[in-house]
Amino acid sequence: MSLASSLSASSPDATLPTMKNHTPTYLKHQFLIAMPHMADPNFAQTLTYIVEHNANGAMGLVVNRPQDLSLADILEQLRPDEEPAPRTLNVPIYLGGPVQTDRGFVLHSPECSYQATVELDGMSLTTSQDVLFAIAEGRGPQQSLITLGYAGWEAGQLEEELADNAWLNCPFSPEILFATPSDLRREAAATSLGVTLSLLTSQAGHA
């Protein structure tokens, strides 16, 4: 994996795949909670933030699978002649999904905008390297989560998986994303629905 190419240098073209025709019936800006019987190893026991969902398909970022990587590891590749700031050793990198796992995405609070930033519903998504340098220098967004890779669904695929009870969906919560330990996020999202995951079966319906 080439960490140096994980985020684009500056081009706004290197943002998330273009998807239009969003309607309120889709799950953009919600969490997907993998049901206990989820067999796909890419998504078993995951919590996923839905970046976009429309008639053309869906894109999301898994937000509870930290890798054995830190922001310091990426910065060492991007700026090999500079020692990463000590704070970057404690900034985890998450596996955002099985698609393009050498490509970086930073989900963050909306008070900052960068060279390749897309505004979401009260959140922002950046794919340019400048956000990493800002975080490293202590002038980045107040809240952020860095992933490599993303999850993608073709047109109608996510709807079929929801109908098959592969997922629960629930409203997005910044407290769950940014203030809850990664290993507790999925359970916290389910709890927000009044659901105990260990009691669910494949026959349970989705929210």
Predicted regions span which residues?
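A short aromatic-anchored loop/beta-hairpin motif
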Residues: 3, 16-207
